[in-house]
């Protein structure tokens, strides 16, 4: 069952989403060769708690960390470890926060130092596909229109779109109905209505669309071990149109300060 949100609920979700946005902005300042994912995880937990919120992922389904940090061929759900990042890595950082009983949840894929042109393109196309999907989130359209927009843009650039992992509704639960696949047919699926809140999150691979789960029970990797990118926003339907509740502004400002390249 889909729970459509009123304006007060949407504002509470926005508050949690912006805590995540600011957390990712703080991490953007320090993501560089030599830092470990576990260090990033600790920094994120401290900041989220300082905002009077709780880490949204920690303990959820028994996940052991504040962040899902997925490096290179890891698609999602990577557990932060001690291995330092190196020049040329890409790192997806997925973060959640819970405040006032409502969740925020979004993600950004960062370049660590200098990355190759083909991986720069992967990041750019994945991010573009996110916004193309968001454009479809208008009253009267359907969930399949979102997936089609994401899939079409990624696949016309010869990238693989992950099938087994999807976006979702968001609210008092981290994962609410409906599921939001990153593939689909125009005019298919549930109708989009006023008050719908979604987490749209393209997961796009440099090579095959196929993925497997590692023995840790969490980490998803590409079957061909080629890199994967992941971007995610939280969006509400307000006055019939998509309104993005999260922002990448803090990340982009931090990356400019660091004189890092970003898409």
Regions found by a protein language model. Name each.
Residues 1-263:
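Active-site neighborhoods and metal-handling regions in enzymes and metal-associated proteins
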């Amino acid at each position: 069952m889909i729970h459509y949100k009123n304006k007060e609920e949407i504002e509470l979700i926005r508050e949690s989403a912006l805590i995540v946005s600011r957390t990712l902005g703080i991490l953007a300042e320090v993501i560089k060769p030599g830092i470990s994912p576990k260090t990033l995880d600790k920094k994120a937990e401290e900041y989220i708690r300082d905002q009077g919120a709780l880490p949204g992922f920690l303990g959820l389904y028994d996940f052991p960390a504040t962040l899902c940090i997925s490096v290179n061929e890891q698609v999602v759900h990577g557990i932060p470890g001690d291995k330092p990042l190196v020049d040329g890595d890409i790192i997806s950082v997925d973060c959640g926060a819970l405040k006032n009983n409502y969740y925020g949840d979004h993600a950004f894929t960062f370049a660590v130092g200098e990355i190759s042109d083909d991986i720069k393109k992967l990041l750019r196309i994945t991010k573009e596909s996110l916004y193309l999907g968001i454009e479809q989130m208008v009253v009267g359209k359907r969930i399949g229109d979102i997936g089609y927009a994401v899939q079409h843009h990624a696949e016309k650039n010869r990238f693989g779109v992950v099938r087994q992992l999807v976006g979702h509704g968001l609210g008092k639960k981290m994962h609410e109905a409906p599921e939001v696949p990153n593939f689909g047919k125009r005019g298919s699926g549930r109708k989009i209505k006023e008050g719908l809140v979604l987490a749209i999150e393209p997961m796009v691979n440099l090579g095959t669309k196929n993925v497997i789960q590692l023995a840790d029970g969490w980490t998803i990797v590409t079957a061909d071990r080629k890199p994967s990118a992941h971007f995610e926003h939280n969006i509400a339907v307000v006055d019939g149109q998509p309104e993005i509740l999260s922002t990448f502004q803090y990340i982009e400002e931090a990356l400019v300060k660091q004189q890092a390249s970003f898409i």
